[in-house]
From Swiss-Prot:
Homotetramer. GO terms for biological process: lipid metabolic process; response to reactive oxygen species. One of its GO terms (molecular function) is pigment binding. It is found in: Secreted. This protein binds a chromophore: biliverdin IX, isomer gamma. Mixed with lipoprotein-bound carotenes, this blue protein provides hornworms with their green cryptic coloration which serves a camouflage. It holds the Pfam family Lipocalin. The keyword Secreted applies. The keyword Hydrolase does not apply. This is Insecticyanin-A.
């Protein structure tokens, strides 16, 4: 489940001059902080498409031999359109229920890695929960890219406890599936 910290969300600055065109493509979820209600699937991939006007997202993972996926819309967050900061909104429809997720890109080189972050304040608990994802254009972080990501995580250690990351599995066995299932669409809830 979520990891809670006392008080409000900390003040965080996403990357400046965010380039959605360069960010587009398939990203492998190398690791993530535990997140309540998120899949525990393997072989998790987020694919961002952008044609210069409209953007979309296709998230997929494999669980028990089934490739489950969600399709949604993607746009730069309203407060980031003019500041050019790396904040975007993903909108998924599960039947009548609409879910908006707002990841912030803390760091990326657009070609090899990205570190996404999100914080939610929970007034009932007077606490916030932090979510973070390490993304890569390849199935593993190696060499210089791994070193860069480790160093970036050190600079954000006041926000993200890297020891809490859960690694994803991109082995051939974990990624095998025999059927697909859409989590989004008019008949899903």
């Amino acid at each position: 489940g979520d990891i809670f910290y006392p008080g409000y969300c900390p003040d965080v600055k996403p990357v400046n001059d965010f380039d959605l065109s360069a960010f587009a493509g398939a990203w492998h979820e190398i690791a993530k902080l535990p997140l309540e209600n998120e899949n525990q699937g393997k072989c998790t991939i987020a694919e961002y498409k952008y044609d210069g006007k409209k953007a979309s997202v296709y998230n997929s993972f494999v669980s028990n031999g089934v490739k489950e996926y969600m399709e949604g819309d993607l746009e730069i967050a309203p407060d980031a359109k003019y500041t050019k900061q790396g904040k975007y909104v993903m909108t998924f429809k599960f039947g009548q229920r609409v879910v908006n997720l707002v990841p912030w890109v803390l760091a990326t080189d657009y070609k090899n890695y990205a570190i996404n972050y999100n914080c939610d304040y929970h007034p009932d608990k007077k606490a916030h929960s932090i979510h973070a994802w390490i993304l890569s254009k390849s199935k593993v972080l190696e060499g210089n890219t791994k070193e860069v990501v480790d160093n970036v995580l050190k600079t954000f250690s006041h926000l993200i406890d890297a020891s809490k990351f859960i690694s994803n599995d991109f082995s051939e066995a974990a990624c095998q599936y025999s059927t697909t299932y859409s989590l989004t669409g008019p008949d899903r809830h």
